[in-house]
Amino acid sequence: DYPSYSIPIKSNSLTFGYTLDNLLYDKLTFDISRGEKFLIVGENGIGKSTLLKLIMGELNPIEGEICVGEKTNISYYAQEHEILDLDKSILNNFSEYNLRDYELRKLLGSFLFSGDDIYKKVSVLSPGERSRVALAKISLSGANTILLDEPTNHLDPMTQMIIADTFKEFEGTLLVVSHNLDFVDNLGINRMLLLPSGRIVYYDRDIVLHYEMLNESDE
């Protein structure tokens, strides 16, 4: 009976690789509970972002399946910022939400945009500024499930904490790919999926620190 209202996302014996000779996952099984804050960690290149793309249906498994419940409405923050219209201003990227001017300015202010900054075209923004615009849109999406793929890339430490505070208050299901200890420490993570082993453990900051140090040494 999966997925159900209480289990919005479930992976059942998922096998995937870009080639049959180099599988990223072999019979990976896990489920995510409604309202849970769930973290995916592992070494660089191990398939963390790929798993989110499988959940979104952008890739197809070789065997097994990822099931998403019919009532699961997902908003997906990808590193490519595909939800942004580069030809529009920051302000006009929010036109579909029908917010009053003061409401939108308040929201953008909470993501560190103020004054005439909101009239800048997204195409001229820095990578960090684009990230902030995309995350602001995610926060407004009305989705009951949010996927965040490395949301702190290009963000300074102060901004990272602001973003963490925003998504800590999110009452839906949150699935995060990150090895940024300071950020995930402030999200209220419940459980973690360790790749490539597929182990599920309760949140352990020492494990996150291990992967943070390991991945930084590879950069």
Language model feature labels by segment:
Residues 3-219:
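ABC ATP-binding cassette signature C-motif
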